[in-house]
Amino acid sequence: MTLAFIRPRIGKVWEHDADVTMLQRSSTHIVKSDSLMEEVLGPLYSEEAVAGGLTHEKADLLFASIPYKVLPDFQRPAFEAIKQRDAAFYQKLEDAGFMLDFGDDESGLFLKYLRRGSGYYIDVGACDLVANGDIKLRSGVGIERINPHSITLTDGSELDADLIVYATGYGSMNGWAARLISQEVADKVGKCWGLGSDTTKDPGPWEGELRNMWKPTQQEALWFHGGNLHQSRHYSHYLALQLKARMEGLDTP
């Protein structure tokens, strides 16, 4: 069986003897899970951090205390260390034709996450299958047309396929709001997430905080909450306080 995929979640299918080809339409930031833990997260979130007296509440506060404007300067050294640590891994991926990046300004995963919420992948093993050639790769192309037993790609070539699996990542919160409520409300609220960094998929102007997250929006009584575990724990307190103040009739912005 031949399968065509549009992103890296492919290892489990390959293990069952499928002939897998992944289509990579644009460059992706890749970081190994263990490298991310040791070089970036470990000092804040690990058994060693807890043993040293750093609870997750303190770690959340420390992480949230860094202004987004200077966060790239904090992140670049860590991701430069990851580049050096996993240089052979990245070279094998590039040799296989995989398009890699570390963000517009080389600041790595977390800035991509905050700015656009896409374009990154935390690797737990599937990338080795791509690097080794066990999973075939076609990069820089998309699907032009789906045929009964094949795919015509945007470069004019044809790929035989019995099954196509779309694994194209995250959609926008604004798009979700349009589907859940209405396009009119989504347009009224405006873009959710992103900092206004004027980087790829995060147009300016600079906001200084995540757009429309955990604060009043242009639509009365509509609030947005999301993010990773740190953000969910930390900012849920501030969201809850704002809601409670309104329920109690307290004067609040």
Predicted regions and their residues:
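Flavin (primarily FAD) cofactor-binding/catalytic cores of flavoenzymes
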Residues: 1-11, 15-26, 33, 69-253
